[in-house]
Amino acid sequence: MTYVNEMKSKHGGITAHIVKTEKFKTVSLTFKMLAPLTKELVTKRALFPHVLLRGTESRPKTADLRSYFDELYGTSVSADLTKKGERHVITFRLEIPNEKYLKDRTPLLEKGLQLLSELVFSPALENGAFLPLYVTQEKRTLKQRIQAVYDDKMRYSNLRLVQEMCKSEPYALHVNGEFDDVEHITPQDLYEAYQKAIREDQLDLYVIGDVDTDQVKTAVDTYFKTEERELKPFERSAANEQPDPKEVIDEEDVKQGKLNIGFRTNTTYTDPDYPALQVFNGLFGGFSHSKLFINVREKASLAYYAASRVESFKGLLMVMSGIEVKNYKQAVTIIEEQFQAMQNGDFSEDDIAQTKAVIKNQVLETIDTAYGLAEFLYQQASAQVEIPIERFLDNIEKVTKEDIINVGKNIKLDTTYFLKGTGGAS
């Protein structure tokens, strides 16, 4: 069975990925910019996408730009940021109604692609730099976004684990950059960082919906004029592994302790044993039938929540849990016991089958939305590999108990981080 028919084409420095499907009533445009994660650039890269959405060369006023979105039947536009291992990804999303369902047959797809290209490639400028007013306003908003991580103790404890575990590795940088670096950014600095990204980033455009493939290719050639560039090969992230696991304890005025434990998996998205790692994580802490959920949360009642997730491009497995401060040692012990049980193969064939079924359902649910489908396909583009959904699911299905035990033996405990509460906020 073929789940997705993805057509790829090169247009200068951009790779277009067109998925023709009648599943959605809208057409989804997703534009991705990928570059190495660096301290010098991460904060500027977190800022300029939001400045770009404030105005274009032809519609420099934000109000005029938003009015135009409304003219295009309420077209929605957004920008966000993610990390894929030691690389920083900027995403622009634009969703437009499918013109086939409109009475007046406005050429919305072409207008949508033209608008996206203007937002990314033709910003509003003043004296060869971004507009100072927009930069000032978006700097304030970026500071608020960075501060929000510190105020949300679940996100903060995960950030602290990564900072301790990946000290002196680019992955330790937060996707939104550094609070103290925001203030010093000038409109000129920001514009230079933006120009570098346009020149050098890996650029991918996803067009998903009931579209005419040739029409899309022609529009991309017309509106997205970029120079060809040599893509840097995808490389395994550097890791400064320590000889012995470390423990880090912070104290803050919170009621609920946050226990986060980081492991190095030594397996990433392009490795042959990656499917086995996915099943390992599902059995260990990824789902509601996993060991962490059943034994730490349900049976021992030691955690308000307990789960694990894999960072596919960096090679990390991270456990996140919320516990009473007095239960710290007991919780660490029982989590370690669940990990040992996984390494020892203490799980049944039924457990494996259930986990595979949940992973498959999760993938199918993900690709059932245009947003999720673009993200799933982008995993391959960012790693510069071809793994069709059918093969990905087949690889999961083929995983054996021995494969799971073997991948588990490569996983090493690295850092235990505890945000110790002293009462106060949760």
Q: What annotation goes with each model-predicted range?
A:
Residues 82-83, 191-198, 308-310, 405-409:
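Short, flexible, solvent-exposed loop/turn segments with mixed acidic/basic and small polar residues
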Residues 94, 102-151:
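Hydrophobic alpha-helical hairpins/lids featuring a short glycine-rich hinge
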Residues 1-73, 104, 178, 184, ...:
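His/Glu-rich zincin catalytic helix
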Residues 132-195:
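Compact, aliphatic and Gly/Pro-tolerant "microcore" segments centered on a short helix or tight beta-hairpin
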Residues 144-145, 245-256, 360-370:
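Short, low-order "capping/linker" segments at domain edges
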Residues 66, 122-146, 234-241, 341-366:
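Acidic/histidine-enriched alpha-helical segments
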Residues 19, 25-35, 63-118, 155-177, ...:
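M16 family metallopeptidases and their MPP-like homologs
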